[in-house]
């Protein structure tokens, strides 16, 4: 099958190359799926997409897949099954995928998901040096039916625009009147040259001049009103576009955040700004520039048809310029947005990890990495700006050539007395009101292309379904027993992190889960709050499957407290009340901070509970953060608390006090701990090793078994 250029798909984020390669093959057979959907099907993780993940995703879409390790002899075959996916190590460092579209004696033709490369050819020697030999060959099954997933285009923003129709109408009216005044000014110039000066009409000249001055004052008032209304429109569009993106981000499942770098998510805000810019410009061009072009075109035609026809000859030149630059701008916009996302990720990562960087004296090393990425971003941005400048230069040359030609030809008409000097000057003055709107319409090309690329990137987020998409009614529970039956879990299509877990936890039980690092303890409890879905098995709360719960209700009933809790910018009181029972009383707040052994620390601060904290409370110790977070959890309405190493930064004495405070509470508490002093005090201990529950019982019982727990305890 011959690969068509229209089937090319570029990756949007760093880890999308496998899904983008699969998308190209699917398009060749008539199926169109977003990268967001393919990521879900292929189990893409923060490390990328495995060949097994691509195979599984293709099989779900009714394709048969052969994954083979082949060699260069594949390209000697007369009927090689092009296109197919090849796994490579790019630049001898990065795992990557190409779509192989063909080959000849010396070259291999590839479609690289990297938007900076796209479709190209490599020498066989260069390709073979990168190729791991792993190839995926896809063919349709008898049950295959092409499917097309709809992605929203820029047209989807029309409802947002129509909601602002009053503001837009006022902007258009103001702009229209301003243009009319400018046109009247041009005719004033013609009358002055052709009538008032030759006939010495001083009185008429004075009256007309004062009248024109008044209209110019009105014009400036309208210009101010237009600028004000444009700001209003811009802010309202920002609320609709940017806030809707933030709202959607908050509704996405944890699996979305665990498979993407922070910068990839935050860089979409600048993408949204590109869309806003394009929307505002398009509104003005559609409603205003087109109207002005038609109106001034009629006036110019009435003024002198010969000169106007000369003007019309320049329009095809503008169109040719647009067509030539379209593919170039698309490629360069992709490059700029992608390198910007990588740069943002690195900066956020390094600021968050600044303490570690300083502790390792690695400032220079990390700076050099950002320096390289920033230079790469600047290079791409400069290339785009250079292309825009070249296009601007060509358009300016066309416009200036047109102006000179009009004056030249117009002067010959004046000399031959076919038009007056005033008519020529007026025509030339009016010409800018015809060409400037056309230039504005042409300039939409770069903005709309940038917006189209930005919209594609936003779509990859919007197409990830909200975890709250399915409306569920709140359930009433007669008890709060937890039960896990035959639970297994794996990230993507990697190895199983949990395997066949059987576990029952009674209401108000105090249970500790222990095990080596990486044994699956944290993953196990994250399933209880539906951060991730089990690969197989069932979890019930109060005898009801967790999948039947509204997630908001579930997380109000089960509160998960991680080892590194986040403290938000604001006062200590604001942080304590986040997620708390509505109208939590002062007595309840004091009880929570006492149970968490943080009351004395807070009250010793100068402003007490009103003490302002910066992002992640860098002024507090790790132990203080953990205790504030614990008090916050105790103020929540949760019946079940999961403390994932939530006291690991505390000294042994404080930790023991907190445990003694928690054990009598009328709540189920699940501790995850490496310190076995925590386990000693709980009702029951669960020992997890390599994703399996291997022992269960009290501290005394497990020591008597001389098993894995006994080894942990003594070692």
UniProtKB/Swiss-Prot annotation:
Residues 168-450 form the ABC transmembrane type-1 domain. It is a multi-pass membrane protein. GO terms for cellular component: plasma membrane. The keyword NAD does not apply. Residues 11-138 form the Peptidase C39 domain. One of its GO terms (molecular function) is ATP hydrolysis activity. It holds the Pfam family ABC_membrane. The active site is at residue 17. Keywords: ATP-binding, Bacteriocin transport, Cell membrane, Hydrolase, Membrane, Nucleotide-binding, Plasmid, Protease, Protein transport, Thiol protease, Translocase, Transmembrane, Transmembrane helix, Transport. SMART domains: AAA (SM00382). InterPro entries: AAA+_ATPase (IPR003593), ABC1_TM_dom (IPR011527), ABC1_TM_sf (IPR036640), ABC_transporter-like_ATP-bd (IPR003439), ABC_transporter-like_CS (IPR017871), P-loop_NTPase (IPR027417), Pept_C39_ABC_bacteriocin (IPR005897), Peptidase_C39 (IPR005074). CDD domains: ABC_6TM_PCAT1_LagD_like (cd18570), Peptidase_C39B (cd02418). The chain crosses the membrane at residues 167-187, 197-217, 237-257, 282-302, 307-327, 396-416. GO terms for biological process: protein transport; proteolysis. Coiled coil: none annotated. Residues 482-715 form the ABC transporter domain. It comes from the Bacteria. Its EC number is 3.4.22.-, 7.-.-.-. It is found in: Cell membrane. Involved in the export process of the bacteriocin lactococcin A. Belongs to the ABC transporter superfamily. Bacteriocin (lactococcin) exporter (TC 3.A.1.112.3) family. This is Lactococcin-A transport/processing ATP-binding protein LcnC. It comes from Lactococcus lactis subsp. lactis. The gene is lcnC.
């Amino acid at each position: 099958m011959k690969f068509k250029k229209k089937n090319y798909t570029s990756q949007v984020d760093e880890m999308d190359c496998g899904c983008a390669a699969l998308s190209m093959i699917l398009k060749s057979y008539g199926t169109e799926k977003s990268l967001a959907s393919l990521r879900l099907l292929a189990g893409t993780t923060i490390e990328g997409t495995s060949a097994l993940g691509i195979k599984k995703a293709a099989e779900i879409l009714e394709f048969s897949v052969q994954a083979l390790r082949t060699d260069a002899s594949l390209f000697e075959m007369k009927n090689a099954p092009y296109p197919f996916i090849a796994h490579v190590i790019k630049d001898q460092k990065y795992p990557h995928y190409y779509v192989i579209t063909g080959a000849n004696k010396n070259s291999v033709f590839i479609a690289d998901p990297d938007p900076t490369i796209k479709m190209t050819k490599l020498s066989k020697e260069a390709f073979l040096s990168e190729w791991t030999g792993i190839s995926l060959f896809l063919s349709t099954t008898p049950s295959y039916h092409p499917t097309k997933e709809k992605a929203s285009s820029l047209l989807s923003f029309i409802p947002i625009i129509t909601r602002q129709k009053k503001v837009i109408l006022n902007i258009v009216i103001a702009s229209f009147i301003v243009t009319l005044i400018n046109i009247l000014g041009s005719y004033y110039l013609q009358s002055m040259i052709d009538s008032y000066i030759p006939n010495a009409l001083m009185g008429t000249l004075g009256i007309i001049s004062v009248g024109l001055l008044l209209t110019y004052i009105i014009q400036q008032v309208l210009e101010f009103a237009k600028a004000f209304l444009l700001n209003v429109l811009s802010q309202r569009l920002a609320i609709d576009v940017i806030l809707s993106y933030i709202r959607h981000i908050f509704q996405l499942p944890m699996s979305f955040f665990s498979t993407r770098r922070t910068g990839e998510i935050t860089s979409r805000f600048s993408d949204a700004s590109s869309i806003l810019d394009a929307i505002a410009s398009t509104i003005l061009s559609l409603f205003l520039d087109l109207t002005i072009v038609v109106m001034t075109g009629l006036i110019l035609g009435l003024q002198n048809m010969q000169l106007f026809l000369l003007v019309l000859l320049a329009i095809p030149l503008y169109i040719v310029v647009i067509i030539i630059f379209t593919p170039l701008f698309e490629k360069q916009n992709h490059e700029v947005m992608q390198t910007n996302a990588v740069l943002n990720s690195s900066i956020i990562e390094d600021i968050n990890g600044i303490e570690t960087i300083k502790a390792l004296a690695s400032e220079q090393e990390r700076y050099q990495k950002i320096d390289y990425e920033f230079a790469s971003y600047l290079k791409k941005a400069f290339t785009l700006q250079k292309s825009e400048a070249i296009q601007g230069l060509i358009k300016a040359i066309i416009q200036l050539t047109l102006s000179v030609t009009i004056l030249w030809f117009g002067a010959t008409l004046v000399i031959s007395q076919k038009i007056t000097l005033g008519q020529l000057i007026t025509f030339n003055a009016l010409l800018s009101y015809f060409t400037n709107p056309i230039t504005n319409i042409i300039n939409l090309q770069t903005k709309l292309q940038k917006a189209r690329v930005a919209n594609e990137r936003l779509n990859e987020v919007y197409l990830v379904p909200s975890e709250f998409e399915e409306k569920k009614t709140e359930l009433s529970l007669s008890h709060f027993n937890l039960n896990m039956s035959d639970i297994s879990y794996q990230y993507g299509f990697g190895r199983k992190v949990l395997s066949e877990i059987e576990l029952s936890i009674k209401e108000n039980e105090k249970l500790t889960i222990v095990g080596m690092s990486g044994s699956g303890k944290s993953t196990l409890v994250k399933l209880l709050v539906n951060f991730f879905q089990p690969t197989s098995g069932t979890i019930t709360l109060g005898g009801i499957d967790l999948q039947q719960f509204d997630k908001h209700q579930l997380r109000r009933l089960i509160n998960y407290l991680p080892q590194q809790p986040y403290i938000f910018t604001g006062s200590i009181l604001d942080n304590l009340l986040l997620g708390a029972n509505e109208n939590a009383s002062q007595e309840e707040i004091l009880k929570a901070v006492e149970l968490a052994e943080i009351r004395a620390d807070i009250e010793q601060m100068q402003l007490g509970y009103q003490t302002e904290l910066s992002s992640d409370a860098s002024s507090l110790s790790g132990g203080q953060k953990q205790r504030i977070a614990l008090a916050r959890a105790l103020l929540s309405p949760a019946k079940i608390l999961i403390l994932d190493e939530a006291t690991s930064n505390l000294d042994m004495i404080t930790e023991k006090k907190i445990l003694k405070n928690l054990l009598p509470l009328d709540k189920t508490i699940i501790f995850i701990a490496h310190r076995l002093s925590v386990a000693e005090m709980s009702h029951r201990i669960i020992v997890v090793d390599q994703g399996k529950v291997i022992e269960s019982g009290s501290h005394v019982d497990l020591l008597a078994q001389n098993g894995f727990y006994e080894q942990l305890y003594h070692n």
